[in-house]
């Protein structure tokens, strides 16, 4: 019986130790190893196929700020804005001209985005709505020349009247024309001023313009970006080092940007936003390089979350204040002069796009309150305007996300151009976009069955082993207690003999004491008087 109790004790203790080590140490390492072998950009893997051509469209929303009092604003009044949208598009992403470098463990490719108008999701909007915005070319050109080439102002002013006859500070046109189909740019004039201005169109410096013939171009905000090359990336495949999966190492065949006056701001940090490495630490954030704004942005951990019953973590993004971080002073016009830094929650895009544009979260959410107060019609709030992503860390899977960004004109009066002489100086919102994704059950089930069922199995197994081990330990303790409680308490013979001897001595002592007391009583005078009285 003693042997069985010891076997039960050893088995239960060993089971408890095994459950703890296997459940919290061994199994997670095995699972991470299996994921690291599956989640790579090596040709022939499922992840490579999904990454190369997204098998489902992302949702792309455009919200436009319609200026309802353009004539008043041209005379210096406060702008009144009306948000119109969303205009909804299906965004398809794919990569082409892929070249692998096995030695460097990288893959180079060109990114392509294709936007298809979704009439049903956009309804009742059709895309033919008339929108009033600051003139898409006159205002940016006038402001840029005033800031950077003031000596050419007279020449450019004349050129604008030739290329855009009868143009005013604000332009009214159809949404689809402004954003995709294009506005006509007439470079047919033989005047020197017009030819000087049109040079930037012929040389391709205006990337949003498409040449239609020898003398005409079409300019639009997004037309040239639709189904066209968005730039060549080189990223890590993650075969040799899984933690480098998707990391951007080159863009446009360059190892860093040259848009900003400091090395820190020109570095690539993170991925191209279409893939993330597994096993990230939540405090490290999610970083991605965005060519449209020439900058890497990081979303930071906010809280725990869930998606379709699966645990996740939520990250959100804040452009912050470049003044408060010395490493970000290179995003100022002059890193040595903080007065040249953009307002809190914004980013100056001029060094990136060549025009007076400001990026921020929609409605200036989390930006300097003065920006919101400068115009009418804004209502910043977290639900509609925050950037967020619900992310599964172990597999590196984004469950759902909303990437939102607003583009505004850094407007100011331009003395040399008559229609712009009385404009107010402020940052005027133009439009904002949202790129959203919500994984459907087809893809969430892939994560669920390959990851979470394994985690649930591990959880069930380890707790079953631990519970059975604890029951075994308690049973062993009870058996040992029962054995101890049933033992007979028997004195050794020597102790019994000595105890009897002591008892005899005590009894003999008592007898002698009684005899002595009796003799003393008998010898006392009058001891028998009571007997005589009883006789009478």
Swiss-Prot record:
Taxonomy, superkingdom: Eukaryota
Subcellular location(s) of the protein: Cell membrane
UniProt keyword Transmembrane helix present: yes
Extracellular side: 29-459
Region (Disordered): 507-536
Principal subcellular localisation of the protein: membrane
An annotated GO cellular component: plasma membrane
UniProt-recorded Gene Ontology molecular function terms: scavenger receptor activity
Regions of this protein lying in the Cytoplasmic compartment: 1-7, 481-536
Keyword field: Cell membrane, Disulfide bond, Glycoprotein, Membrane, Olfaction, Receptor, Sensory transduction, Transmembrane, Transmembrane helix
InterPro entries (UniProt xref): CD36_fam
UniProt xrefs under Pfam families: CD36
Cysteines joined through disulfide linkages: 265-330, 294-352, 332-341
Membrane topology per record: Multi-pass membrane protein
Glycan attachment points: 66, 213, 226, 440
Function: Plays an olfactory role that is not restricted to pheromone sensitivity.
Protein name, UniProt field: Sensory neuron membrane protein 1
Species in which this protein is naturally found: Drosophila willistoni (Fruit fly)
Source taxonomy: Eukaryota, Metazoa, Ecdysozoa, Arthropoda, Hexapoda
């Amino acid at each position: 019986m003693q042997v069985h109790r010891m076997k039960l004790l050893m088995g239960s203790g060993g089971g408890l130790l095994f459950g703890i080590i296997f459940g919290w140490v061994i199994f997670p390492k095995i699972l991470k190893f299996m994921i690291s072998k599956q989640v790579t950009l090596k040709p022939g893997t499922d992840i490579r196929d999904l990454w190369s051509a997204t098998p489902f469209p992302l949702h792309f929303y455009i919200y436009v700020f319609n200026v309802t009092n353009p004539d008043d604003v041209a005379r210096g009044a406060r702008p009144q804005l009306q948000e119109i949208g969303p205009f909804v598009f299906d965004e398809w992403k794919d990569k082409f001209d892929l070249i692998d470098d096995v030695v460097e463990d990288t893959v180079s490719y060109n990114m392509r985005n294709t936007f298809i108008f979704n009439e049903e999701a956009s309804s009742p909007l059709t895309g033919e709505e008339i929108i009033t915005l600051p003139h898409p070319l006159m205002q940016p050109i006038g402001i840029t020349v005033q800031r950077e080439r003031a000596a050419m102002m007279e020449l450019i002013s004349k050129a604008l009247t030739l290329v855009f006859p009868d143009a005013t500070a604000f332009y009214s046109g159809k949404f689809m024309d402004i954003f995709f189909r294009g506005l006509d740019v007439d470079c047919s004039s033989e005047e020197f001023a017009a030819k000087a201005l049109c040079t930037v169109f012929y040389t391709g410096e205006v990337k949003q313009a498409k040449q239609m013939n020898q003398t005409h171009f079409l300019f639009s905000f997004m037309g040239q970006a639709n189904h066209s090359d968005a730039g060549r990336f080189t990223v890590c495949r993650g075969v040799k080092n899984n933690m480098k999966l998707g990391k951007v190492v080159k863009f446009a065949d360059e190892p860093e940007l040259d848009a900003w006056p400091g090395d820190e701001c020109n570095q690539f940090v993170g991925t191209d936003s279409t893939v993330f490495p597994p096993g990230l630490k939540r405090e490290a954030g999610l970083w991605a390089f965005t060519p449209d704004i020439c900058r890497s942005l990081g979303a930071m951990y906010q809280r725990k979350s869930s998606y379709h019953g699966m645990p996740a973590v939520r990250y959100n993004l804040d452009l912050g204040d470049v003044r408060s971080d010395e490493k970000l002073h290179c995003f100022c016009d002059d890193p040595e002069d903080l007065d040249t830094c953009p307002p809190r929650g914004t980013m100056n895009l001029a060094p990136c796009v060549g025009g007076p544009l400001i990026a921020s979260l929609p409605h200036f959410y989390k930006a300097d309150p003065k920006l919101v107060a400068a115009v009418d019609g804004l209502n910043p709030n977290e639900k509609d305007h925050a950037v967020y992503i619900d992310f599964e860390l172990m597999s590196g899977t984004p469950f759902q996300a909303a990437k939102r960004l607003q583009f505004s004109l850094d407007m100011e009066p331009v003395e040399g151009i008559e229609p712009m002489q009385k404009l107010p100086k402020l940052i005027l919102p133009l439009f904002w976009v949202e790129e959203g994704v919500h994984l459907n059950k087809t893809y969430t089930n892939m994560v669920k069955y390959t990851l979470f069922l394994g985690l649930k199995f591990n959880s069930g197994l380890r707790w079953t082993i631990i519970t059975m081990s604890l029951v075994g330990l308690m049973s062993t303790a009870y058996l040992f207690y029962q054995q101890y409680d049933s033992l007979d308490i028997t004195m050794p013979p020597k102790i019994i003999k000595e105890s009897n001897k002591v008892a005899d001595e005590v009894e003999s002592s008592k007898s002698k004491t009684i005899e002595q007391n009796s003799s003393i009583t008998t010898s006392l005078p009058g001891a028998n008087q009571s007997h005589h009285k009883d006789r009478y």
